[in-house]
Amino acid sequence: MAFRWVYQAGSIWVPFDDRANAAIENLWRACSHGNVYHAGTVAYVNAVNLYMLQDNVRRAITRTGY
């Protein structure tokens, strides 16, 4: 099973690109946090508390399987 990380944008969940998805998966497996490149900018991702900060906006993130 493959896993996909998504973030909440209003009432929809948006998938991260493949590069960011792999980086977030690594952070999650390490119970860690850090900066991830996504959508042409840097986002801080806290994979333990399941949120990201991008352009001073905090968004919920979650891990899905497909």
Where are these regions (language model features)?
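Eukaryote-biased intrinsically disordered, low-complexity acidic regions enriched in Ser/Thr/Pro
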Residues: 1-66
